[in-house]
C-alpha cells in the first residue's frame, strides 16, 4: 500500500503473467481451496480457452496440473529437451523453492512418480536430509546470525562434504535463490585451507534483510 512496501516483496515475480503464458500453450487444470473454505474450486483452461470453472471437494492448498506443453505451438515444442531433462530442471527449481520456504510443503509428481515431497514442518535440516541424503545431513554446521541490518541462517557443510562443481552451493536473499560469483568466491576462500583444488563446499544460506537490496544477481 506504500512505496516502501516494494522493498519487502515476498513473492517471486510475475507469477500471474507466467501462469497466463503457460495456460496459452498447454492444458492446465488448477484445484485450489483456502483452509477456511468448505469447498474448493476446479478451473480448467486449454490454449487460453476456459473449459471449466466449478466447485468441488478438495484438500487445503493448490494443485496445478500442466499437460501437453506446447501442444498448439509445434514450432516451440521442438525446442524442448527430453522429458527426463526437462523434469530434472523442474525438480531442481522446486528443490530450491523448498529450501528457501521450509514451512511450505511441496509435492512434485512427474509421469505418475513422486519426485519430491517435503513435509513443510519448517525444519531446514530435515529438508536437506530429504533432498541431499543422510551423509550430508550428518555433516552440517548451523549458521545463525542476527544483526541490526540483516540476518543470516542456514547450514554449511564440513569439509568432508564437497564435490567437483558448485551444485552443492545454495544462496538465497529474502527467499529468492540467487547465483553470485562474488558470494561463491568468498565462501570458497573460507574453505581454501580445507578443500583440495577444484573441490567446492556444501552451503544452504538464507540472507534476510528488510532494507533495499539489488536482487538482480541471478
Predicted regions and their residues:
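N-terminal phosphate-binding caps/lids of nucleotide- and nucleic-acid-binding domains
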Residues: 1-209, 213, 218
Amino acid at each position: 500500500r506504500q512505496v516502501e512496501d516494494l522493498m519487502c516483496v515476498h513473492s517471486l515475480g510475475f507469477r500471474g503473467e507466467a501462469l497466463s503464458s503457460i495456460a496459452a500453450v498447454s492444458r492446465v487444470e488448477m484445484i485450489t481451496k483456502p483452509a477456511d473454505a468448505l469447498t474448493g474450486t476446479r478451473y480448467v483452461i486449454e490454449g487460453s480457452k476456459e473449459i471449466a470453472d466449478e466447485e468441488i471437494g478438495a484438500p487445503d492448498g493448490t494443485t496445478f496440473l500442466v499437460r501437453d506443453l506446447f501442444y498448439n505451438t509445434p514450432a516451440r515444442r521442438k525446442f524442448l529437451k527430453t522429458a527426463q531433462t526437462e523434469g530434472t530442471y523442474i525438480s531442481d527449481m522446486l528443490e530450491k523453492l523448498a529450501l528457501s520456504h521450509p514451512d511450505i510443503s511441496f509435492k512434485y509428481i512427474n509421469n505418475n512418480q513422486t519426485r519430491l515431497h517435503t513435509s513443510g514442518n519448517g525444519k531446514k535440516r530435515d529438508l536437506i536430509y530429504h533432498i541431499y541424503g543422510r551423509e550430508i545431513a550428518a555433516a552440517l554446521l548451523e549458521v545463525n546470525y542476527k544483526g541490526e541490518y540483516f540476518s543470516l541462517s542456514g547450514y554449511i557443510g564440513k569439509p568432508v562434504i564437497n564435490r567437483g562443481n558448485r551444485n552443492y552451493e545454495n544462496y538465497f536473499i529474502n527467499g529468492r535463490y540467487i547465483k553470485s560469483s562474488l558470494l561463491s568466491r568468498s565462501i570458497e576462500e573460507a574453505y581454501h585451507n580445507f578443500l583440495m583444488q577444484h573441490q567446492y563446499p556444501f552451503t544452504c544460506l538464507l540472507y534476510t534483510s528488510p532494507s533495499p537490496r539489488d536482487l538482480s544477481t541471478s
